Amino acid sequence: MKFITAILVIFCVYLLSTAGDSKILPLKKLPSKIFGHLKSHVDNTVKKPLKVFGHLKSHVENSVGPLRMNKLTPNCIFGVKSMSMVLFTKNIPDGKYISLDSDLGRDLDLTKTIYFTAHGFISNVNHSLSNRLSRALVEKDYTVFSLDWSDAACTTGGLPLVKLLGYPSAVQNTREIGNLMADYVMSLIDHGASLRNMAFIGHSLGSHVCGFASKKIYESGYGKVPLLFAADPAQPLFQLKQCPDRLCDTDAKLVITLHTSQIGLGYPIGGLDLYFNGGFVQPKCHLDITCAHIRSVLYLINMVEKKCSFPGIPATYKQILNPFSKFPYPNSKTTDCFVMDDSIFNPRRKSLQNLAGGIYYMFVDPDTFCTRKNFNCQR
């Protein structure tokens, strides 16, 4: 029953996401070769290889006869069929798909901070908030690689209602997508990029993708990703899993988790767990879980676009779960508070690793989804 409820909620997310899609970038189904890492999939129905990041591997997808099954079912149930990267820079504000033949030397400044973003279930890089987040980070003079794993995330193919039934497949695909993302990151490092200048942002299922990518990078001997933002990491089919099979606080030097809805993992999962407005219901969303779920991305965007800051005070998970808990708004005399603003996006910030870990109740203005600017309190 809980799974069915979760599926219905996810369908609402789908309806919301399709309503807000941006048409700025053309969605390409065939990803490209990257730095010599090649993965080939063969689809017998079209007799063409599909190139995907990774090492050489062959996969055969059987034909289902005159009526193509993927006309009715989402592509995600067939496994990882394709993925690609979109590069955003100051000179490429609209983003462009990257292939092996692209001369990244013209577009990529390896001295700048590089962000990798990963969308969630039934979404893509064209989604309005995903695109807006990438553009906002570029305005801070960061380089952004936006991972498009829409085929494996059940975005393409199939009927809307049937796509929801593909959620378990999308969950299963997060590990392989994460591994392929790691291959891409390691290729960049092999060609001169520094892991110390990199950070990840994942929303919902994309948070777990970033977690799996970080795990592989570390296990491959490249070190730990400095900073990983998990925007309301997906809960369905992850809530009972242990660290090896989901996002974990050890995946990066600092994992910052933004909790905003009931569809996200409610229990602490990062090195710094931030419960915005209590972590379950957001201002003006009321009981709309989909609104609260995507609000985690909007808060990140607001920090960059509007220079918002969000003050928080220490809390326990028991206090967070208690609907009768009261949290006093901090002031200049408050101690042990935490203020989150756009400075937190810099993975090279010296004080980043000194941030007090733990759980914080984060205050959100009900009208502006922001809080006081230049807010200070005692540390």
Curated annotation (Swiss-Prot):
EC number in record: 3.1.1.32
Annotated GO biological process: killing of cells of another organism; lipid catabolic process
Reaction(s) catalysed by this chain's protein: a 1,2-diacyl-sn-glycero-3-phosphocholine + H2O = a 2-acyl-sn-glycero-3-phosphocholine + a fatty acid + H(+)
PTM text: Contains five disulfide bonds.
Location in or out of the cell: Secreted
Disulfide bonds: C76-C154, C243-C248, C285-C291
Main subcellular location: secreted
Propeptide cleavage-removed residue intervals: 21-73
Residues in coiled coil: none
Role of this protein: Catalyzes the hydrolysis of phosphatidylcholine with phospholipase A1 activity. May act as an allergen and induce hemolytic activity.
PANTHER family attached to this UniProt entry: LIPASE, LIPASE DOMAIN-CONTAINING PROTEIN-RELATED
UniProt name for this protein: Phospholipase A1
